[in-house]
Regions:
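Conserved beta-alpha junction segments in alpha/beta enzyme cores
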Residues: 176-180
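Phosphate/diphosphate-binding loops
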Residues: 228-235
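Conserved helix-loop functional segments at active or binding sites
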Residues: 95, 115, 220-228
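Active-site beta-loop-alpha junctions of metal-dependent nucleic acid enzymes
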Residues: 203-225
Length: 235
C-alpha cells in the first residue's frame, strides 16, 4: 500500500464472497448511487480510541433505547466525508455500502448530541488514555487558542438565578467580540492541541468572556487531570 502503516490490514485474507444477480436492460437496477467505503478505515480508528466500548458500556448502563454509537459514528463519518446539518447527515445513512443504522428514529440524533455533551469529559479522557498508550502521546508543547460561533437569534440567552438572586447558570449565547464582526450573540470555544497537531480538548464559555480569561478554567478542567508531564503552554 501507499501508506506503509496500513500493511497489516492489507495482508489480512478475507473469505471470498460470491454474488449472483440478473438485470434487464432499462431496469432501474442498472443505475446506482455511489456507495461509501472509506468509513471502514475510520471504524478502525474509533475502535483504537476505545470509543466503541465506551458507547456500548454506557448504553447498557443507562438503558438507552436507540443506537447511540451508530448515531455518533454517522455524525463523525459525515463530518469528515460529506459535512451537512445533523438531520441531513442522518439521511446519508443509505449512502454507505453497509448502512450504519438499521431501524431508527432520525430525531434520536439530537438525543445523541445530548449524550455526547453530558459525557464530553469522559470521552476526552478515554481518547487521551488510548493515545498515550497506543500513540505514545506525551506533548512537550500544548497550544491553546480561542474562537467563537455566532447564532442568528434575536436576543442573547438570559442568566438563571435562584429565589435569593444568586446566579445558578450563566447563559452561553451572549453579545461579545465576534471574530466575523457580526452583531449577534456568540459562544466562545477554547481548543487545546498537542505538538503533533492532534486536538486534546475543547471548552465553551459565554460569548461575553474575554479570550485571556478562558485559559485558566479551561486548563484546570481539561488538562490538569490528564497526567501529562512537564510541557510548555503556547496560547
Amino acid at each position: 500500500p501507499l501508506i506503509p502503516s496500513l500493511s497489516p490490514y492489507c495482508d489480512v485474507k478475507k473469505a471470498e464472497e460470491t454474488y449472483r444477480f440478473a438485470i434487464n436492460e432499462g431496469s432501474p437496477d442498472c443505475f446506482g448511487h455511489p456507495k461509501l467505503f472509506s468509513h471502514i478505515l475510520m471504524e478502525r480508528i474509533l475502535e483504537e480510541l476505545g470509543l466503541n466500548t465506551f458507547f456500548s458500556s454506557y448504553k447498557g448502563f443507562t438503558k438507552l433505547q436507540y443506537d447511540v454509537y451508530g448515531f455518533a459514528r454517522l455524525l463523525i463519518f459525515g463530518r469528515l466525508l460529506n459535512p451537512a446539518s445533523k438531520y441531513m447527515t442522518v439521511r446519508q445513512n443509505e449512502d454507505y455500502y453497509e448502512p450504519i443504522l438499521k431501524d431508527f428514529n432520525p430525531d434520536n440524533v439530537y438525543d445523541t448530541l445530548d449524550f455526547i455533551a453530558d459525557n464530553k469529559d469522559k470521552i476526552i479522557r478515554r481518547i487521551n488514555t488510548n493515545l498515550v498508550k497506543k500513540a505514545h502521546r506525551s506533548p512537550e508543547i500544548i497550544y491553546y487558542d480561542v474562537t467563537n460561533f455566532y447564532f442568528e437569534i434575536g436576543e442573547p440567552d438570559e442568566d438563571t438565578f435562584d429565589e435569593d438572586g444568586n446566579l445558578i447558570e450563566k447563559g452561553q449565547r451572549k453579545i461579545g467580540v465576534c471574530k466575523e464582526e457580526r452583531k449577534l450573540p456568540i459562544v466562545q470555544m477554547g481548543l487545546f492541541m498537542d505538538d503533533a497537531g492532534i486536538p486534546i480538548a475543547i471548552e465553551t464559555f459565554p460569548g461575553n468572556t474575554l479570550d485571556h480569561l478562558t485559559l485558566r478554567p479551561a486548563l484546570k478542567k481539561n488538562i490538569n487531570g490528564l497526567d501529562f508531564s512537564r510541557f510548555i503552554m503556547v496560547a
